[in-house]
Amino acid sequence: EADVPYEDQVLLHMFPERLSMPEFHPRVWYFDLEWDVNTDATTVMAVDDTHAEHPVVFAWSQESEGQNGVTIDFIDREGGYERRMYGSEGEMHDAFLDHLDECDPDILIAHAIAWADLPHLIRRLTEPDRLSPVGNVIRPHVKNGYKETAQPITGRLILDTAAKGSTGSGIESLWIKSGRGNLPNRKLQTIAEELKLSGKIQQDEDGNKLDVRTWWYTHFDLFVDYCLVDTTELRKICEMINFVPFFTTVQRFCGVQMKSTHRVTN
C-alpha cells in the first residue's frame, strides 16, 4: 500500500467495489495557442468546447491593437466559429480566463500541452492560477515544462495528446493498445492523415507554405483559421479513437485518479 499514491488509496477506500465509482462525463476543452516566436506574446487562442454550439477564437492583431473592448464576428470559414478580437494580449488573456471561469471545463486537451501550451500560459498570464477553479497551479520546470502525465492544475484535468506511447498516455499509447501498430511520428498532421482527415492548414491560397513566424503579420485571417483547425482536427481525432472515454473508463474500472491511468497495463 505504501507504493500506492495517497489519492488512489482514498478512492479505493471510497469505492471498494469494481465499477462503483460514478461514471464521469466530462466537459472538455480542446484548445490550441499561437504565439510570436520573437516576443513570446500569445497571438491566437482557439477553443472547441464539447458543450458549445461552435468553437470560439480569442485573438488580437496589429490592426486591433489599442481598440477598446471586444469585437465579435461569426466567421463562416472552416465549419464556422466565433472570433473575438481584442486590443492587446493582456485583454485577450483576461477574456479567455473569464470564459474558462464561465464554462468550467473538466478537462483541457491540447497537442503538447505539457511542454508547450501550458508552460506558455504560465509564462504569459498575469494570473496563471486562474487556470485552476481553486486557484492553484503547480509551476513547470523552466526548461523542460511538465511531465507528459502531470496533473498540475488543481481541480481541472489535462491530457496531452502528443505524449510518447511509452508513458501510457497520449494518442500514440492508445493507438498501440488498439492494435494499430506504431505511428510514423506523433505530429498532429501525421495522425490526421492516418485517419483520412484533412489535417492542418499548411499553405496559403497561392501555395506558399505556412510560416508561423510571419503569418500573424502577413496572413492574419488565415493564421486564425490555422489555429482553429488545429483545435477542431484534434477533437475529431480524439472522438474517432475514443480518446477521452478510454481514460475515463480505465479510471472508473480501476478506481484510481486520472494521473494513475497511464500506469495501468494489460
Short names for language-model regions:
Residues 99, 103, 111-112, 120-124, ...:
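Generic, well-ordered alpha-helical scaffold segments in large soluble proteins
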Residues 71-184:
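Conserved DEDDh/DEDDy metal-dependent 3′-5′ exonuclease domain
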Residues 3-9, 13-107, 128:
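Conserved RNase H-like, two-metal-ion catalytic cores of nucleic-acid enzymes
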Residues 38-40, 118-119, 167-169, 186-191, ...:
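Short helix/loop capping segments that flank catalytic or ligand/cofactor-binding pockets
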Residues 210-266:
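Common nucleic-acid-contacting/processivity interface regions adjacent to the catalytic cores
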Residues 33-37, 51, 64, 114-117, ...:
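Short, flexible loop/turn elements at secondary-structure junctions
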